[in-house]
Amino acid sequence: MSYRKTVVSARRDQKKGRVGGLTEEQKQEIREAFDLFDTDGSGTIDAKELKVAMRALGFEPKKEEIKKMIADIDKAGSGTIDFEEFLQMMTSKMGERDSREEIIKAFKLFDDDNTGFITLKNLKRVAKELGENLTDEELQEMTDEADRNGDGQIDEDEFYRIMKKTSLF
């Protein structure tokens, strides 16, 4: 099995249990945050409440960002958003955050010696741990494909770029 197939397989397994890009647990967290800040029970939240709800979910939105988000999603122009609109917006936000975070976590797993780079040695170790019988030549090809600046190692940006290119994240 190739490295790409291994990553595809792992990614597929990870996606199981997700509905609409979010796990049921994440959807429940979003519902709880929305309900908590819909203090009047109207089924909608305004810009101020949106900011607080997003903070409760671990985001730090700026005032301008909040205004733009409401304008983008509040097609009726009411100045408020309902739960479905909030869920749609947070699904997108969490998806953006999750993919970057997942890729960085994966990078750190490869970079076990904390050099800030993935070397051929790191790649060999991971392949061995995964039970992949890859030759040095195959591992070198993988390194070469990701190594855009030609320094023989893969930095975080190069890793992020190659992972996004594979359409797995």
From Swiss-Prot:
Residues 1-24 are annotated as: Disordered. Gene3D superfamilies: EF-hand. Residues 25-60, 61-96, 98-133, 134-169 form the EF-hand domain. One of its GO terms (biological process) is cell division. GO terms for cellular component: myosin II complex. InterPro entries: CALM/Myosin/TropC-like, EF-hand-dom_pair, EF_Hand_1_Ca_BS, EF_hand_dom. The keyword Calcium applies. Ca(2+) 1 binds at residues 38, 40, 42, 44, 49. Pfam families: EF-hand_7. Keywords: Calcium, Cell cycle, Cell division, Metal-binding, Mitosis, Repeat. One of its GO terms (molecular function) is calcium ion binding. Ca(2+) 2 binds at residues 147, 149, 151, 153, 158. PANTHER family: EF-HAND SUPERFAMILY PROTEIN (PTHR23048:SF59), MYOSIN LIGHT CHAIN 1, 3 (PTHR23048). This calcium-binding protein is found in the basal body complexes (the functional homolog of the centrosome in animal cell). In mitotic cells it is specifically associated with the poles of the mitotic spindles at the sites of the duplicated basal body complexes. Belongs to the centrin family. This is Caltractin. It comes from Dunaliella salina (Green alga).
